[in-house]
Amino acid sequence: MKRWLQRSLFLALAVVLAGFLAVACGDDDEEEAAPTSAAPTAGAPTAAPVADVPELEDGTLQVLSDIAYAPMEFYEAGTNEAKGFDIDLADALGEKLGVEVEFTNTGFDGIIGALMAEDGDVIMSSMTVTPERSEEIDFIDYANVGTGILVASGNPEGIAALEDLCGLTVAVQEGTIQQDMLEDLNAGACADNQMDVVTFDQNPLAVEELRVGGAVAVLADFPVALNDANESEGELEVVGEQFDAAPYGIGLRKESTELKSALEGALQEIKDDGTYDSVLKDWGLESAALE
């Protein structure tokens, strides 16, 4: 009887001890697993929605831009701070994508080559979409802008249309659609009385040529020509209204399909929430809005 009782007590204690050890081990396992199943803390950053976009893996969008084309992109006088419509729009897109935006000042005439060499992820530099450019790179349309003719105040040559430039000296930035326009004009309507087309690396140099009398007109995007006139203290004016309006496009390499999709989504978001219209208004470019 005593031996049986001792055995019974031993078995009972063994069962209790086994249960205690099982509970203890279970607690340890639960404590180790807790961090993987815990709900995220309010306000904690979430996984980036563009994590599968190769160009954005480092958390930045690298933008190539010729930052000498006010009010689209320019440096604040005496600083290295880039400003302008394209700058603000790129920043708004970056905010939607959850990435920082970094700008690289790049000469316009070589900017497509720089993109193809992967010096940046995209071009945002008042680039008009053309069939020729579209053969090299892809675009996302984001504004609609035409061309303007900038002349000396009072319009001493009486220029009213492109054809009135025949036989005159005209300054223009190299690599722009305006240079193409002038070359086409020389091959067509001005073939018998060709213009002397003087090209410059940047638009401000073309404008200075007009100011010192080396040219009678400058062709540039209409908002840029208008800004040049407004900043000239009455020395310059724009002839009439813009003509040949066409889309500006964000330029991308053709293989950047994921980035293009992400940017298209971000652009739609800033249109939907009013940011797009606000940025246009900030720079007096309401007429450039895409429908």
Positions of predicted regions on the chain:
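Periplasmic-binding protein-like
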Residues: 67, 144-151, 226, 230-268, ...
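Extended ligand-binding regions for polar small-molecule ligands
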Residues: 87-96, 155, 163, 168-169, ...
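Ligand-binding cleft/hinge of the Venus flytrap
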Residues: 75-76, 90-97, 178-199, 229-233
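Bacterial lipoprotein signal-peptidase II cleavage site
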Residues: 24-35
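Acidic, polar ligand-binding/catalytic clefts
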Residues: 100-164
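A ligand-binding cleft/hinge motif common to bilobed small-molecule-binding domains
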Residues: 109-110, 127-134, 181-184, 211-244
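Short beta-strand-to-loop elements that line the ligand-binding cleft
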Residues: 64, 100-107, 172, 193-202
